[in-house]
Amino acid sequence: MTRSAKKGPFCDGHLLKKVEAAVGGKDKKPIKTWSRRSTILPDFIGLTIAVHNGRQHVPVYVTENMVGHKLGEFAITRTFKGHAADKKAKR
C-alpha cells in the first residue's frame, strides 16, 4: 500500500538540513547518507548524494526523473555473480 497523499513524501530531517546547506553554499561534494528510505524531492535535483548500500557509499546524481522515488532504489545492495555454469555443456 502506498503512503497517504495527505501526509506528503517522507524525507529524514538530517538529510534535508544537509541538502539545504549544499544548495545554499553551492558545495559540490557528495552528501553522505545512510537514509535509503528518504524520498527524492525536487530540491535534490542536480546534487550528488552518496547512498549507503550496506558496504560502501554509492554516488547517485539526482535528475528530474528520479523525483518521487526512494534513494535506496538507486544504490544496489546485492551483487550478482552469475548463475553456475553447466559442467556438461562445457565439454
Swiss-Prot record:
Q: Which family does it belong to?
A: Belongs to the universal ribosomal protein uS19 family.
Cysteine pairs forming cystine bridges in this chain are: none
Could you give one GO CC term from the UniProt record?
cytoplasm
Protein's name in the database: Small ribosomal subunit protein uS19
Q: Which residues form the signal peptide?
A: none
Which species does the entry assign this protein to?
Cupriavidus metallidurans (strain ATCC 43123 / DSM 2839 / NBRC 102507 / CH34) (Ralstonia metallidurans)
Q: Extract one GO BP annotation from the record.
A: ribosomal small subunit assembly
Molecular function terms in GO for this entry? rRNA binding; structural constituent of ribosome
Record's InterPro entries?
Answer: Ribosomal_uS19, Ribosomal_uS19_bac-type, Ribosomal_uS19_CS, Ribosomal_uS19_SF
Q: What gene, per UniProt, encodes this protein?
A: rpsS
* Superkingdom per UniProt: Bacteria
The family database entries (Gene3D superfamilies) matched by this protein are listed as: 30s Ribosomal Protein S19, Chain A
Sorted alphabetically, the keyword list is: Ribonucleoprotein, Ribosomal protein, RNA-binding, rRNA-binding
Keyword set includes Ribonucleoprotein: yes
Instruction: Please explain the role this protein plays, according to its UniProt record.
Output: Protein S19 forms a complex with S13 that binds strongly to the 16S ribosomal RNA.
Tell me where the transmembrane regions lie. Answer: none
